[in-house]
């Protein structure tokens, strides 16, 4: 993140966890509001202490989190939510198409048997919802494909995007790329979502897989035009 991220009100919270048979570095994000911090994605099981440490470094207690927004229901984003909610009295929000997977009414869409403890969803999101933050308005964008109700969060005043898994940057060189086909059930919708992102003015992106990327609209348009081929 830029050096002035503390003033900007948006902070990446990179955590390294054991997930399945892999060691992953993942990037939840904290967004400051007048009410307190909002957490974007909770990480998988075992993420709690890493998130707590990041919040402490920013001058917050874990208990200050009042809202958790899930970009989608995959276990590496939502599997740690039950543990988090044991320590935090927070509102849980996700897209209405993702809610049944989070609450346990449906099994995870990718069918990998990675069923985490279900939690209640308090607020169902839809595209066009705007959340006021200290970094300016944060708009909910519907970016389905990687998951049926995947959302990304867009800050139009600064051209800043929290992509979730609609975009990734976890290759060796950190290049901004489209979602990985092997983890994306509906690549046609995913490509449409990249095309939608290409219509926005974006200068900087945070990817859950890859972290902060200092590139935006030009690269996203390339991905859309090439059909995610690279």
Regions found by a protein language model. Give the residues of each.
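Short, structured coil segments at secondary-structure junctions
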Residues: 6-8, 87-88, 201
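Divalent metal-coordination and catalytic microenvironments
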Residues: 31, 41, 51, 72, ...
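Active-site HxH/HxHxD metal-binding segment of metal-dependent hydrolases
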Residues: 46-48, 54-130
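Internal catalytic-core helix/loop-beta-alpha segment
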Residues: 122-144
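Conserved beta-strand hairpin/beta-sheet module of binuclear metal-dependent hydrolase folds
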Residues: 2-58, 152-170
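Residue-level marker for buried hydrophobic side chains located in beta-strands
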Residues: 38-40, 69, 92, 160-162, ...
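Metallo-beta-lactamase
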Residues: 45-46, 137-144, 148-227
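Short Pro/Gly-enriched beta-strand edge/turn motifs at strand-loop
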Residues: 7-17, 109-113, 134-136
């Amino acid at each position: 993140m830029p050096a002035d991220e503390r003033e900007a009100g948006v902070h990446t919270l990179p955590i390294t966890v054991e997930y399945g048979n892999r060691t992953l570095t993942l990037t939840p994000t904290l967004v400051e509001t007048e009410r307190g911090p909002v957490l974007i994605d909770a990480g998988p099981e075992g993420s709690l202490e890493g998130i707590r440490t990041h919040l402490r470094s920013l001058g917050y207690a874990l208990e200050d989190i009042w809202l958790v927004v899930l970009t989608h229901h995959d276990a590496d984003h939502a599997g740690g939510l039950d543990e988090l909610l044991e320590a935090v009295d927070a509102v849980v929000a996700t897209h209405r198409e993702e809610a049944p997977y989070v609450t346990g009414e449906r099994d995870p869409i990718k069918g990998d048997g990675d069923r985490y403890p279900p939690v209640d969803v308090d607020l169902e999101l839809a595209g066009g919802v705007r959340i006021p933050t200290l970094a300016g308005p944060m708009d909910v964008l519907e970016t389905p494909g990687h998951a049926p109700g995947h959302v990304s969060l867009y800050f139009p005043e600064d051209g800043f995007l929290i992509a979730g898994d609609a975009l990734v940057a976890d290759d060796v060189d950190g290049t901004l790329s489209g979602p990985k086909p092997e983890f994306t059930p509906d690549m046609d919708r995913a490509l449409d979502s990249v095309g939608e992102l290409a219509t926005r003015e974006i200068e900087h992106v945070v990817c859950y897989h890859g972290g902060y990327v200092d590139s935006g609209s030009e690269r996203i348009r390339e991905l859309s035009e090439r059909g995610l081929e690279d």
